[in-house]
């Protein structure tokens, strides 16, 4: 009788250990599978598919997502140009020029106090902005097939109380016309730099 009770306890204990190990392994498998799926989804979101592999990619434009393709440029409605949205702001954070631009945050507190008397180097800011944006444009898959440099126009507004710079970038390439209308194509993006 004593032997049979301890045998039952031994069998129950053994089954309990097997179930515990199975549960742990199952949990690890599910967590690993979910993390792998999330990583693949993130990498698909971050790394835009190779645009040059899409048939007729030039007619589609820089963005393959319909919601991005249908964005209208808010600052020109003359109809002379075809504006296509090129989301370069996702590439901007990788550039070292951002650190040099953000160094203006050191000046911002003094600009708040003496903004009427302080003259900072606008040419320096503009040249850094241009270099930074051109590097980001060249990282975008769509714009990598252009051989020449983009003709870039940058407009910015420094909002000192809010400690931010609003940037409007418009760029174009020579002999880049819309196939349907024959009008010159201009690409654009707008973004905000926080100086905090």
Curated annotation (Swiss-Prot):
Record localization: Membrane
Keywords assigned? Membrane, Transmembrane, Transmembrane helix
One GO CC term, this protein: membrane
Topology relative to the membrane: Single-pass membrane protein
The regions listed as transmembrane in this protein's record are 11-31
Instruction: Please report the name of this protein according to its UniProt entry.
Output: Uncharacterized protein MG286
What is the source species?
Mycoplasma genitalium (strain ATCC 33530 / DSM 19775 / NCTC 10195 / G37)
């Amino acid at each position: 009788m004593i032997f049979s009770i301890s045998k039952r306890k031994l069998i129950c204990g053994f089954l309990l250990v097997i179930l515990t190990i199975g549960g742990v392994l199952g949990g690890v498998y599910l967590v690993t599978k979910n993390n792998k799926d999330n990583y693949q989804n993130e990498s698909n979101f971050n790394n835009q598919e190779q645009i040059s592999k899409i048939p007729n990619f030039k007619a589609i434009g820089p963005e393959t997502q319909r919601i991005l393709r249908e964005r209208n440029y808010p600052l020109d409605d003359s109809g002379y140009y075809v504006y296509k949205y090129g989301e370069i702001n996702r590439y901007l954070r990788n550039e070292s020029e951002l650190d040099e631009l953000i160094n203006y945050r050191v000046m911002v507190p003094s600009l708040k106090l003496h903004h009427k008397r302080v003259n900072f180097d606008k040419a320096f800011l503009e040249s850094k902005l241009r270099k930074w944006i051109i590097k980001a444009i060249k990282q975008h898959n769509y714009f990598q097939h252009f051989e020449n440099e983009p003709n870039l126009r940058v407009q910015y507004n420094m909002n000192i109380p809010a400690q931010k710079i609003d940037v409007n970038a418009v760029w174009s390439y020579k002999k880049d016309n819309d196939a349907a209308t024959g009008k010159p194509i201009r690409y654009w993006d707008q973004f905000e730099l926080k100086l905090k």
